[in-house]
Regions:
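Conserved PLP-enzyme active-site core in the AAT-like
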Residues: 1-134
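Active-site C-terminal subdomain of aminotransferase-like
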Residues: 83, 92-187
């Protein structure tokens, strides 16, 4: 919906009979005027896109970006890292993945994570990892950012709750929660 709202022409890539998106179907849609593709992984059927590396490679070879809908991120937390799968950008639904209330009494919170390829375009302020620590970036000097965000970043309480959830579970607990989510989805 957002892509259409800002003037992009949106086309669907059909899934195969197995419920998965195949690289050949993606390649048919790619061309010089394609800015990005969006894929939910695991998809709405609960299936992990087995050919995600080939899809990412095809998208990048066409000069486009690979955006991942993080709606089902809870199934891969601690198991796979989206950047390692070739994803350039992904939004994270805190209420689906990190146990925050939907909206929490105010605007929701859906952080967006970017690959190094897109980091230079992030509006300020944003956080980035530098030398093993988080750094707050508030200056657009040396970047290609389109400016400073003037809207809210989301409901701050949701970020605190999500962080508390992550810290209380730790890496092993988050991985176990993901494995349990997959088991439940396939039951």
């Amino acid at each position: 919906a957002t892509a259409a709202l800002i003037g992009f022409e949106v086309q669907s890539v059909p899934a195969g009979e197995d419920g998965l998106v195949h690289p050949a179907a993606v390649r048919e849609k790619l061309g010089p005027h394609v800015a990005a593709i969006m894929l939910t992984n695991p998809n709405t059927c609960g299936l992990f896109e087995r050919e995600i590396f080939e899809i990412a490679e095809a998208v990048h070879q066409a000069g486009a970006y690979f955006y991942c809908d993080g709606a089902n991120f809870n199934a891969i937390v601690g198991v796979a890292r989206p950047g390692d799968l070739g994803v350039d950008a992904m939004h994270i639904n805190l209420h689906k993945t990190f146990s925050t209330p939907h909206g929490g009494g105010g605007p929701g919170s859906g952080p967006v994570v970017l690959s190094e390829r897109l980091a230079a375009f992030a509006p300020v302020p944003f956080l980035r990892e530098k030398e093993g620590a988080l750094e707050l970036v508030e200056d657009t000097e040396g970047s290609q950012a389109f400016g400073r965000m003037t809207a809210f970043h989301g409901q701050m309480g949701m970020y605190v709750r999500a962080l508390a959830y992550m810290l209380s579970h730790g890496g092993d607990g988050l991985r176990q929660a993901s494995q349990d989510a997959v088991l439940n989805a396939n039951y």
